Regions:
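Pepsin/retropepsin-fold aspartyl endopeptidases
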Residues: 2-282
Length: 282
């Protein structure tokens, strides 16, 4: 009898653990996410940060909120890596409701907390952004959050980037004559490009100056990095001027490059990013 009671207790505990794992999995994958569309006025930052310091960050596969008071209790611990070799185990939570600029409401998504960053109060990462489409208007500095099925009229001359991983939007770029794979499109990075020293030295284009800058792109801390300004650089066989390249281990295509265009359409449904100017031919 005691054995049967113990066995039943263990079965019950294992059932609870299984249910909890399934719930955490579904929450983490974003199956419950619901988004009310709207327009958001971005701030003065060079990246995709709103006026109330919320970053729409395609370079992050997770979301972050500085306070865990808005969510349900702790779901599980997760290992977070900032891409520069820094790791932290942080708590993951689930929230039913988060509002950005009193315009866009995001419901039922997971986020991490447990550390402070004075640069922003929240990150909306690809666990959420992969469920919606975005249209950026550079002249008005407005980010238009659209439904998953929305698609604007796009000119035939638009610059097109396609990626394969819904959560990690990496592309291949030709910089002058160098083909570089696995460059992450990162709207949380405020430069044009980030590549390592090996590729910087191989580029043939002239660069005008080197300087050292501080960057917050390590997520947990700041670091000093080298910034090189290329007076001219071919990117996918198009010539661009005054390209700001930061020397990092991470390969990034940043928001400064995206904002060189009048409009940017992020098509999450078809894993494609379109960039064009108002005078481009339709």
């Amino acid at each position: 009898m005691k054995y049967m009671n113990f066995k039943n207790v263990m079965i019950f505990i294992l059932s609870l653990i299984t249910v909890w794992i399934v719930v955490v999995f579904f929450c983490y994958k974003g199956y419950f996410i619901n988004i009310e569309v709207g327009q958001i006025q971005l701030g003065d930052c060079r990246d995709f940060t709103t006026q109330d310091s919320v970053v729409f960050d395609t370079g992050a596969d997770f979301s972050y909120i500085s306070s865990n008071k808005i969510g349900f209790p702790f779901l599980s611990p997760v290992l977070v890596n900032d891409g520069e070799g820094n790791n932290k185990i942080l708590p993951m939570y689930f929230t039913q409701y988060f509002e950005v600029n009193d315009k866009v409401k995001i419901k039922n998504f997971t986020y991490i907390s447990g550390f402070k960053n004075n640069k922003f109060k929240a990150i909306i990462g690809m666990n959420v952004l992969s469920k919606l489409n975005m249209l950026f208007h550079s002249t008005q500095n407005i980010l238009d959050i659209k439904s998953f099925d929305f698609k604007p009229q796009i000119p035939s001359s638009a610059t097109i980037l396609q990626y394969k991983d819904r959560i990690s939007p990496k592309v291949t770029l030709r910089l002058d004559n160098e083909v570089i794979d696995d460059i992450l499109i990162d709207t949380g990075f405020d430069g044009d490009l980030s590549i390592d020293e090996h590729y910087i030295e191989k580029l043939k284009s002239n660069h005008s100056c080197d300087s050292m800058i501080s960057t917050n792109n390590t997520l947990f801390d700041t670091q000093k990095v080298k910034k090189i300004i290329f007076s001219e650089l071919y990117i996918n066989e198009r010539l661009y001027k005054n390209i700001h390249v930061v020397q990092l281990k991470k390969r990034l295509l940043g928001s400064k490059f995206l904002k060189r265009f009048d409009k940017v359409f992020w098509d999450s449904k078809n894993l494609t990013v379109y960039m064009w100017n108002e005078n481009d031919e339709y």
